Amino acid sequence: LVHVYVGKMTPAEDPFVDLARSAIRHYLATGEVVDPPSMSGDPPPSGVFVSLHEPAEPGQVEGKLRGCIGTVRPREPSVRREIARSAVSAAVSDPRFPPLQPGEVDQLE
């Protein structure tokens, strides 16, 4: 679904990937950006980029880009909020793509 990496974790191991996916689902259902609480062990506020990709075709490393938004410097008080906001923006505000629809979320990598 998204490429949000901290350290050397794979997307399946990274709790921030789940956060991004949940933030997108929440926004598509409610129209509101979730405000996730900071957690012990979180990195300090920082810029993040969230990339959404369609499923990869056989022989491809990754699928076609479906949305990508991010910041170089933090705009939010926590990295979790930065990820949530960037994930939602990638899903519905990337001017290169139509807004993501609820049925598409589970299909993204």
Model regions: which residues?
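Basic nucleic-acid-binding interfaces
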Residues: 2-109
